[in-house]
Curated annotation (Swiss-Prot):
It comes from Prochlorococcus marinus (strain MIT 9303). Pathway: Metabolic intermediate biosynthesis; 1-deoxy-D-xylulose 5-phosphate biosynthesis; 1-deoxy-D-xylulose 5-phosphate from D-glyceraldehyde 3-phosphate and pyruvate: step 1/1. This is 1-deoxy-D-xylulose-5-phosphate synthase. Belongs to the transketolase family. DXPS subfamily. The keyword Magnesium applies. It catalyses: D-glyceraldehyde 3-phosphate + pyruvate + H(+) = 1-deoxy-D-xylulose 5-phosphate + CO2. Mg(2+) binds at residues 144, 174. The keyword Thylakoid does not apply. The gene is dxs.
Length: 644
């Protein structure tokens, strides 16, 4: 069957193993063709092609439910659920999303983007099914990295106490998350995966049974359970963790052997309670470069299929904020042995892979465990260490209670570096870093800041480490501004003090973080239109520099705030509340992300859609204050502050 003709997963029913293997070949070809052109997640999807086909041949996707954890491995799923023709629009504005979205397809049974949620969601569907007296199957597909997440373990604990609820968990064990997984559970899975006795027993049972004359060289599906029982008798540790938690354990099995997986899944569906099928796969399967470098090819920008190398970008770019952070932290760690970098399975993305290589004794990876990471850091701070937790803004949301309860209330000196803060682009709404400003505003004792460029990032990191309390620093995705960097001798900033970058009497612009350079360009455009603006680099969200902002707001009489974050409870709201509390009641216009989700697109396309480019902001400001009809406001008296 041609992949282009496969528009419904139920078309897999009745295909022979050879035909399924041919479909698998076509999926890999299309997967590589599109991702090499437009970029996207590569290794995860290549690793689950056979798993997807084998599982779907045993299900009726018009009725049964499958929840893919995270969703970045679901490109094969998308290719066989009616999106083959549009797949070349992957992760592009208005095109196929890089993750699962319920609004995109009826076969995307649960949306995701963050790890470890699949078992809870699929179990919830099973509970609803039982209450309604229905009979559809519920399946969660989760990776070994995501299985270390607390919510996944909580769900397994719950499911194990529902012995009469049919429910299948497929453990996609590729010994990777984005980076290699860590922890005791991962070590246990690794022992199971590579256990020589397990492989010997499995192979011996199958070969002996197949050799019986009346078997015809085939192994009945029902004997898979017998194989599992024999393995557990001979090697008690295999599957013991899951068996003790109430699951029937089956595996480990080869995740690229379609025939064996089909038999195993058919058997698993017949078990009357929770079942875990342990499938061992190779991340990046079928593309040698991705198999050899599973971290580097987890996700890729456009690349050359023949050489595997990324296509050259246009022009030389400054180093990314993540790289500047990582290199600066290395030097600070070398100067102070009490500084420790912590990541939650995102070393490469946050720049901490540099620290891991340079100063490994001052580096910790806790796995996909954001809540634990925050409280671990709190405990370390209690004993005099200086933990620096580098984490994506969107993932830190998962540890909001720990930020309050374990760090904020106790006023502990923990530094949080929130990478990918603001608009991130093609990963879409699950990954936009638009909420951290709002949620950090509400936590007492925190000092919160954002740099205007990479040099200010260096100074802010030093400021955080010298501060005797919790501090949070947000940095955007992508390259810096290209300003000169200092190798050492960074001076800390005065806490809660901003700076004036340019002066004008018509308008006050107060910008935060990545929006400061955009504010300066906007001010230039306004000046060309006859409107002269003062621009403040706020630097700090908590505490806000009221001593700088309030007098200028009173004198100038028009205030614009700029942020790349949610307007609801955001930086602009903080400025407005501060002015209002001191009876500085001047017209104010807040620019940021409105109360909406930001869908997948390039960062530039997202900013254009939100009206956040300098040209758009200049036009919006003039329209809001009715300035575009006035050739110049220079010399005019500013509006007086209102009184109550």
């Amino acid at each position: 069957m041609r992949l282009s003709e496969l528009t419904h997963p139920n078309q897999l029913h009745g295909l022979s193993i050879a035909e399924l293997e041919d479909v698998a070949r076509q999926i890999r070809e299309r997967h590589l063709e599109v991702v090499s052109t437009s970029g996207g997640h590569l290794g995860p999807g290549l690793g689950v092609v056979e798993l997807t086909l084998a599982l779907y041949q045993t299900l009726d996707l018009d009725h049964d439910r499958v929840v893919w954890d995270v969703g970045h491995q679901a490109y094969p799923h998308k290719l066989i659920t009616g999106r083959y023709g549009d797949f070349n629009t992957l992760r592009q504005q208005g095109g196929v999303a890089g993750y699962l979205k319920r609004c995109e397809s009826s076969f995307d049974h649960f949306g995701a983007g963050h790890a470890s949620t699949s078992i809870s969601a699929a179990l919830g569907m099973a509970v609803a099914r039982e209450r309604r007296g229905e009979s559809f199957k519920c399946v969660a597909v989760i990776g070994d990295g995501a299985l270390t997440g607390g919510i996944a373990l909580e769900a397994i604990n719950h499911a194990g106490h529902m012995p009469n609820t049919p429910f299948l968990v497929v453990l996609n064990d590729n010994d990777m998350s984005i980076s290699p997984p860590v922890g005791a559970l991962s070590t246990h899975l690794n022992r199971m995966r590579h256990s020589a006795p397990v492989q010997f027993i499995s192979d011996s049972v199958e070969e002996r049974v197949k050799s019986l004359p009346f078997m015809g060289g085939e192994l009945p599906a029902e004997l898979d359970l017998l194989k599992g029982s024999m393995r557990r008798l001979s090697v008690p540790k295999v599957g013991a963790v899951f068996e003790e938690l109430g699951f029937t354990y089956m595996g480990p099995i080869d995740g690229h052997d379609i025939e064996r997986m089909v038999r195993t899944f058919e058997t698993a569906h017949k078990v009357g309670g929770p079942v875990l099928v342990h499938v061992v796969t190779t991340k990046g399967k079928g593309y040698p470069y991705a198999e050899a470098d599973q971290v580097g090819y987890h996700a890729q920008s456009a690349f050359d299929l023949i050489t595997g190398k990324a296509l050259p970008s246009k022009g030389k770019k400054p180093p990314s904020y993540s790289k500047v952070f990582g290199e600066t932290l290395i030097k600070l760690c070398q100067q102070d042995s009490t500084v420790v970098g912590i990541t939650a399975a995102m070393a490469t993305g946050t720049g901490l892979d540099l620290l891991q290589k340079a100063v490994p004794e001052q580096y910790i990876d806790v796995g996909i465990a954001e809540q634990h990471a925050v409280t671990l850091a709190a405990g370390m701070a209690c004993e005099g260490l200086k933990p620096v937790l580098a984490i994506y803004s969107t993932f830190l949301q998962r540890a909001f209670d720990q930020l309050i309860h374990d760090v904020g209330i106790q006023n502990l000196p923990v530094t949080f570096v929130m990478d990918r803060a603001g608009i991130v682009g093609a990963d879409g709404p699950t990954h936009q870093g638009q909420y951290d400003i709002s949620y950090f505003r509400a936590i007492p004792n925190f000092t919160v800041m954002a740099p205007k460029d990479e040099a200010e990032l260096q100074r802010m990191l030093v400021t955080c480490l010298q501060h005797q309390g919790p501090a949070a620093l947000r940095i955007p995705r992508g390259s810096g501004e290209g300003v000169p960097l200092l190798d050492e001798g960074w001076e800390p900033l005065a806490i809660g003090r901003g700076e004036v970058l340019c002066e004008g009497d018509d308008l006050l612009i107060v910008a935060y973080g990545v929006m400061v350079p955009a504010a300066m360009i906007t001010a230039q455009l306004l000046q060309e239109a006859g409107v002269k603006a003062t621009v403040i680099n706020a630097r700090f969200l908590r505490p806000l520099d009221q001593a700088l902002i309030h007098p200028l707001a009173r004198r100038i009489g028009r205030v614009v705030t700029m942020e790349e974050g949610a307007l609801a409870g955001g930086f602009g709201a903080a400025v407005v509340e501060s002015l209002s509390d001191q009876d500085v009641l001047v017209p104010t216009f807040r620019i940021g992300i409105p109360d909406q989700l930001v869908d997948h697109a390039s960062p530039q396309q997202s900013r254009e859609a939100l009206g956040l480019t300098p040209t758009q902001m200049s036009e919006r400001i003039q329209e809001h204050f009715c300035l575009n009809s006035q050739p110049s406001l220079v010399g005019q008296e500013a509006p007086q502050a209102l009184s109550t």
